[in-house]
Amino acid sequence: FVRILDREPCDFSRGRFRSERIHHQVNIKTKRKMSFWKKLLLMILVLASLSYFVWQNEDFQRKYLYPYDYQDTINFYADRYEVDRNLVASVILAESKFRQDATSVHGARGLMQIMPETGNWIATQIEDDSFSVDKLYNVNMNIKYGTWYLSELQTEFEGNEVLALAAYNAGRGNVYEWMEKYHWDINFKDYTKIPFPETREYVKRVLENKKHYNKLYK
């Protein structure tokens, strides 16, 4: 019994030492984890700050977000058909992201995504005997036809960009149907009420693009 009592303090001390050592190791691991998360958070904040300043940089935006390829051609036909230059660029960005060879699943072609039947109709209206469907991939012809069509729609809808853009995307027939069904007049501006989700998003995107183009290309 005495031997057992003599041994107890020693066992207790060893147990206490072991407990303290484990506690110390846990503290070290906890501190390491905290240090790791602090470093990670700092890195995220630094990257977020850099990203913000890069994305706000106008040169970066012009080059990567809101380019103005074919600017001379856009300006020429926009002036010729009395359409806002930046509106034409905004439509091209939304339609094809300035890819000359873009083709939609529905068959729309080129920079301004003109359907073959629409292209043929435009050719008749402007008396262009040189039209062929393959030429819709030609930069000059595509921008010429698309800009003329925008001008035609803006005239038809009395300068209302929302209705003209909705017609460019969904067809003028649908727009007239919506105007009658929902009692829209020629002053309609609330694109959020457009019933087709694709057209609603399209009009929103083009108008947002135009705001950026107006800011970047004054």
Question: Predicted regions: what is each one?
Answer:
Residues 1-35:
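N-terminal Lys/Arg-rich, disordered targeting/topogenic segments
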Residues 2-5, 14, 46, 50, ...:
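Generic secretory/membrane-interface signal
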Residues 5-7, 18, 39, 57, ...:
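Intrinsic disorder/low-complexity segments enriched in polar/charged and small flexible residues
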Residues 38-56:
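Hydrophobic membrane-insertion alpha-helices, especially the h-region
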Residues 53-218:
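Catalytic glycan-binding domains that act on GlcNAc-containing polysaccharides
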